[in-house]
């Protein structure tokens, strides 16, 4: 966790390397509805508008600390086989999710997943107490991501 201005930001970064070509990994993860298959907190993700490219809007419902929360995500950047960046928001948080893809010489792919959560309003005050839960969320997402990508 770090402080950005007056806002508390939770920053989770995880990398996984899987024995899959970058094209297959990117195609799978650039469809954000697949979060239901690899993000243990996701209850459902639906695409509302768009074809998956920049400007596409997704509605994500997740369970965090026993409560369901809904964020609307928009694809801000999509560079095939290199990067996918989305921004999600609701009344208490702004989320920035970035997935970076690196093809390796042996044909495997390394995916780096960075999730930044900027808490808003009174939720900022709880940031120090939420840090362990966000770390756990990152660990669970890493395991889910690795498992889903290995099954491709």
What do the PLM-derived regions correspond to, one by one?
Residues 1-47, 53:
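Hydrophobic ligand-binding cavity/cleft-lining segments
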Residues 19, 38, 78-79, 104:
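A short, compositionally biased micro-patch
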Residues 20, 49, 64, 103, ...:
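Non-catalytic surface loops within mature trypsin-like serine protease
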Residues 27-34, 40, 135, 139, ...:
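Short, intrinsically disordered, mixed-charge
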Residues 46-92, 110, 140-152:
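Glycine-rich portal/gate segments that line the openings of hydrophobic small-molecule binding cavities
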Residues 87-140:
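Beta-strand/loop substructures that line and gate deep hydrophobic ligand-binding cavities in soluble
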């Amino acid at each position: 966790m770090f402080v950005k201005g007056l806002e508390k930001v939770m920053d989770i970064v995880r990398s996984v390397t899987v024995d899959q070509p970058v094209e297959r990994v990117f195609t799978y993860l650039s469809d954000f509805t697949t979060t239901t298959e690899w993000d243990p907190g996701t209850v459902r993700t639906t695409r509302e508008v768009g074809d998956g490219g920049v400007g596409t809007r997704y509605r994500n419902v997740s369970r965090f600390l026993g409560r369901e929360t809904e964020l609307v995500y928009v694809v801000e950047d999509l560079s095939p086989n290199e990067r996918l960046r989305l921004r999600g928001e609701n009344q208490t948080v702004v989320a920035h999710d970035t997935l970076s893809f690196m093809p390796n010489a042996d044909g495997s792919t390394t995916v780096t997943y960075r999730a930044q959560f900027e808490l808003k309003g009174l939720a900022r005050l709880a940031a120090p107490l939420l840090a362990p839960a966000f770390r756990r969320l990152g660990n669970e997402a890493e395991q889910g991501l690795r498992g889903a990508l290995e099954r491709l």
